[in-house]
Each structure stands twice: as structure tokens, then as C-alpha cells.
């Protein structure tokens, strides 16, 4: 057996081709940790109807950003960067919740490598049962069904880690530098939305998001800012205000310069590359916003990788 520790990076995933869009959406819409559609036994049938209707439109979104999601390559790069920081005692693996490599794939690879110790690191900074909770539930289910025996530790949040806040603040400051006068800029933090019912049932996601914004603005300094939510995925009430409504409100208030800050996303994918850059960018231009800029995603930011490495070192003690 190997003395190495497996670093298992848990991420949402994304289609690696246009043909993979349909199965990706099916995996998403049949996950009852994030979306409950009718009784459990009916959800696969209802999900298929929804996905059959949505898939052509979503395929077009992916076509506009290169025909696939870059999230696998970006997550693997984060893993490689972590290995360099942590040294030869660690080896990284990736488990995508709704695409390949799946949790089953990742655990099989760890087993083949003869590694017995695993640190599962969720790449969602803000805990929610719909994201980290779902990934951990899937991991525990696969472990139980496979009978695999690992010594396993979990890292399920880092929304207030000083290095995460520093890395995010760095990106905001860099984004502000692209404007002639930062005093004229509205900083718009855009987080992935969740059904309002999750928060009412005690999910800490919104509290975590708000704390991240507070801590980032402490480092960035003075500046007008707001928090909104994107990527609503069903008809039930989700967190508000929506990003679309916020951009419209900013335009009506006479704001001309917006800095979009993707929050709850640590890698570029459809929510940043299409929704913010293309969809919201076009909407903002049509509404009279003169300068619409998105701060860079963290991806393999050195500060962000240092944050993840610190989390792993703490979990490994």
C-alpha cells in the first residue's frame, strides 16, 4: 500500500462536449439534494421531460463558450498546483458530481493507486446541502456500496478563510483597476442562487455568502456594492434579488460602470463564461451600462492554491 494521501477534489462538473449536455442535465435534475420534483419515483420521468426541452438551448450556450465546459481541466490544474505546494506525499484526484470523472471513477483510481488515506476537499467555499452536501452524500453512498475502506477526512467549507478572502479581494482590486475612477464603480457580487426554502430550513449558505462579501469589502475598502443571485433552475421561489433584476436596477439608477464579481464559483464555467460575460453583458449594454467588467475567477490563483493547501495541511494533522 502507498503511504501517500489522496486529495479528492469535489466539484460540480460540466459537459465535456455538446453530446454530454443532455446526460449532464439529467444527472443534475435527478439529484434530489438540489431539486425535488414530485415524488422520488417520478422524478426521473419528470426530469427527462424538462431536460429534453432545455437541452437544445443549453447546448447553444456551451457552443458559444467553445463547445464544452472547461471545469475539468481547471480543476485538474488546481489539483496539480496543490500537489506542487504539498509535496510528494499527496496525489490529487477529481470527482465531479454530475459528469466525468465521477465519484465512482475517482475512488476506483485511488484504490488502484493503493492509497488508503483520503482528504475530500469540496471546492464550494460556502456550505449548502445542495452543493457540498450533495457531493458528500454521493461520496458516502459510493463508499458504502463499494465496501471500500479508506481513512477519510472532509473539508466542507472555507468561506471565511483568510487566504480565500485575500485571493478574492485581489481579483476585485484588479477588476477595479480597469476603471478610470473606482469611485464610480458599482461592485456586484453574483452568487449562485438556491431555493428560498433551503434557507428557511436552516441551510447556512446565505449566511456564508454574506460573510464572504463583508470580509472582502473590509479588504477592498470603501465602495458601493450589492449582492445578487444567478442561475435559478426551477419555478419555486429562489434567493433574490436576481442578477438580471439587479443590473436593470443599476441602469435605472444611472449607474454606468459595473464590476461583476462571481461568488461561490472558484473556476470558470458556464455561469461565468456565458451567463455573466455574454448574457448579462449584452443585457447591461442594452440598458445603457457603459463599462461592464467581470473580475477574474480564482482558478489557479497562487493565493487561492495556498488557501487550499492550508486547509489540507490542517486536515492532515
Swiss-Prot record:
Chief place where the protein resides: cytoplasm
Family the entry assigns: Belongs to the ferrochelatase family.
Family matches, as CDD domains: Ferrochelatase_C, Ferrochelatase_N
Enzyme Commission no: 4.98.1.1
GO cellular component, one term: cytoplasm
BP-aspect Gene Ontology terms: heme biosynthetic process
Entry protein name: Ferrochelatase
TM stretches of this protein: none
Pfam families: Ferrochelatase
Reaction equations catalysed: heme b + 2 H(+) = protoporphyrin IX + Fe(2+)
Binding site for Fe cation: 192, 271
Keyword Lipid metabolism: no
Localization per Swiss-Prot or TrEMBL: Cytoplasm
Annotated metabolic or biological route of this protein: Porphyrin-containing compound metabolism; protoheme biosynthesis; protoheme from protoporphyrin-IX: step 1/1
Function: Catalyzes the ferrous insertion into protoporphyrin IX.
Record-level Gene Ontology MF annotations: ferrochelatase activity; metal ion binding
Entry keyword set: Cytoplasm, Heme biosynthesis, Iron, Lyase, Metal-binding, Porphyrin biosynthesis
InterPro entries xrefs: Ferrochelatase, Ferrochelatase_AS, Ferrochelatase_C, Ferrochelatase_N
